[in-house]
Amino acid sequence: MLSLVGRVASASASGALRGLSPSAALPQAQLLLRAAPAGVHPARDYAAQASAAPKAGTATGRIVAVIGAVVDVQFDEGLPPILNALEVQGRDSRLVLEVAQHLGESTVRTIAMDGTEGLVRGQKVLDSGAPIKIPVGPETLGRIMNVIGEPIDERGPIKTKQFAPIHAEAPEFIEMSVEQEILVTGIKVVDLLAPYAKGGKIGLFGGAGVGKTVLIMELINNVAKAHGGYSVFAGVGERTREGNDLYHEMIESGVINLKDATSKVALVYGQMNEPPGARARVALTGLTVAEYFRDQEGQDVLLFIDNIFRFTQAGSEVSALLGRIPSAVGYQPTLATDMGTMQERITTTKKGSITSVQAIYVPADDLTDPAPATTFAHLDATTVLSRAIAELGIYPAVDPLDSTSRIMDPNIVGNEHYDVARGVQKILQDYKSLQDIIAILGMDELSEEDKLTVSRARKIQRFLSQPFQVAEVFTGHMGKLVPLKETIKGFQQILAGEYDHLPEQAFYMVGPIEEAVAKADKLAEEHGS
C-alpha cells in the first residue's frame, strides 16, 4: 500500500516537473521579481518595507473570498506590500483591510479591522499605498478614537493635519536615554516595595476580578494630575462598560474638558466586541499617538494599556485565521516577535519619555502561561495582584513579596527607602513562614519574639491597604494620596515598634500613619463608651 502511494506521489511530482519546463519557469520567476515592491529587502522588516514602498495608492483589486475576518483580494497589477491598508469601496461605513500574506502572484490575504458582514465577492478594493494612518497631535486630547483613527465619541471629526502610520521602527540605540528616576504614584505599597521608573514599563499582573482596572484608573487619577503631562489610554479587548465609565469619570474629574482644549488624555478603544484584527492593532494605534507627543513635542507621556493579554489573544486569533501552526498552549508561533516589536517602541529617548503601565490578565492565575511569561522579559517593574490578599479585604491587593522593581536599588532610591522596604518584606516573609505553625498549634505555642513578629506583620499588612479616590463610591472611604516620605516614615515607625500598643484594625484603609493613630484613638473612645 505504502509503495503504491509512493509511486503515485513520485509520478504526480515528476508530471508537475515535466509540465514546468525551464522556458516556462523563467518568465514566471521574472514576473515574481517584477511584482516585488521597490526598496524591499529580504529581511522581515515589514514596517520599513510598507513605509518605503511606492505610494501609488491607485492599485485596485477585487474581493475573491471572505472567511470571517479574513478577506482575500486579487490584484491584476501592483500587488500591495505586507502591512499596507486597503479600503473596500462602495460601502456606507469605512472598512479597512490590512495585508497579512501574499498568496501566489496576484492575491493577498488580509485581516479586516471591522465586521465583514455584507461583503461580497467581486467588490472593489483600493490600495491606500501605506500602512494604516491615524490622526496624531494635540487635537486628539479629550477624544476617543478607534483602531483606524475614526472618532467614536460623537463629537465630530478630529481636526488635525498630522497623520502617522501605526507601524514604525523602534528608536535607535543612540537615541535612547539611560537616566533613572522614581515615579511617585501616591500608592503606599507600590512606592515602597516596587517603585516605578520614570520612562519605564510597568506590568500589573492579576487574574479576573482582583482590581487591575481600578488600580490603573487610580494611577491615571494620581499620576496624570500630579505629573501634569499628557496621557494616552489604550483599551484593548476589555469591557465597553468600563471604557464608558472611565471616559465619564475623566470628564467629572477634569482630566477631559469638553469646553476647551485643556484635556490631558487621549483615548483609543478596541473593545471585546471588535474583530481580532482591530484588537491586535489598537495597542499600536495608542502607542503611535504617544510617540508623537514624545518625539515631536518632547513630552513625558504616560501610556496605559488595559489589557496587554488581549493583544496577545487577538494575535493568536489572527494567527489561527491565517492558518499558522500554533505554538505552546495554542498561542501564535510569533508570540515573542509580536510582543517585542511593540514593547521596543515604548522607550525613553533624549527627546522625551513614554512611561507605560500595562494591565496583564493572568489566565487561571498561572504566571508560567506563555502570554504573561513573555511580557515579563520587557518590564522594569511588576505589580502582582493576589487573590489571597483580595480575599482578606486588603485593597489594592498587591502581593508585597511577588512584586518587583528594577530600581529597588540603594544607589537609586536611597539607603533609607531600601532598608525600610527590605525590612517590611522580611517581616512579612517571616509571618508567612509561621502561618503553618499557627494553623496547626495556634498562636499560644509561639515564642514571644515570634508573637511580636506576627503582630507587627499583621499591622504592616493592613497598613499596605489604602482607600482609592476612584473607588470612593464603593468603599465609602475618602481616597488618599500619600507622599513617598510619609510612606517610608510610617513603615519605619511600625518596624521600630513605636505602634505596638495600637490595635491592628486601626491600620486598615488609612493614608499616612497619623491617620492610623487618630483611628486608634477613635476606636478606643467607641470601645470605652
Swiss-Prot record:
It is a peripheral membrane protein. It is found in: Mitochondrion inner membrane. Acetylation of Lys-133 is observed in liver mitochondria from fasted mice but not from fed mice. Mg(2+) 2 binds at E238. ADP binds at G209, V210, G211, K212, T213, V214. Keywords: Acetylation, ATP synthesis, ATP-binding, CF(1), Glycoprotein, Hydrogen ion transport, Ion transport, Magnesium, Membrane, Metal-binding, Mitochondrion, Mitochondrion inner membrane, Nucleotide-binding, Phosphoprotein, Transit peptide, Translocase, Transport. One of its GO terms (biological process) is proton motive force-driven ATP synthesis. Mg(2+) 1 binds at T213. The keyword ATP-binding applies. ATP binds at G209, G211, K212, T213, V214, R239. The modification N6-succinyllysine is found at K124, K133, K161, K259, K264, K522. It comes from the Eukaryota. GO terms for cellular component: cell surface; mitochondrial inner membrane; mitochondrial nucleoid; mitochondrion; myelin sheath; plasma membrane; proton-transporting ATP synthase complex. Phosphate binds at G209, V210, G211, K212, T213. Residues 1-46 form a transit peptide. Catalytic subunit beta, of the mitochondrial membrane ATP synthase complex (F(1)F(0) ATP synthase or Complex V) that produces ATP from ADP in the presence of a proton gradient across the membrane which is generated by electron transport complexes of the respiratory chain. ATP synthase complex consist of a soluble F(1) head domain - the catalytic core - and a membrane F(1) domain - the membrane proton channel. These two domains are linked by a central stalk rotating inside the F(1) region and a stationary peripheral stalk. Homotrimer. Component of the ATP synthase complex composed at least of ATP5F1A/subunit alpha, ATP5F1B/subunit beta, ATP5MC1/subunit c (homooctomer), MT-ATP6/subunit a, MT-ATP8/subunit 8, ATP5ME/subunit e, ATP5MF/subunit f, ATP5MG/subunit g, ATP5MK/subunit k, ATP5MJ/subunit j, ATP5F1C/subunit gamma, ATP5F1D/subunit delta, ATP5F1E/subunit epsilon, ATP5PF/subunit F6, ATP5PB/subunit b, ATP5PD/subunit d, ATP5PO/subunit OSCP. Belongs to the ATPase alpha/beta chains family. HAMAP family: ATP_synth_beta_bact (MF_01347). NCBIfam families: atpD. This is ATP synthase F(1) complex catalytic subunit beta, mitochondrial. The lineage of its organism: Eukaryota, Metazoa, Chordata, Craniata, Vertebrata. The gene is Atp5f1b.
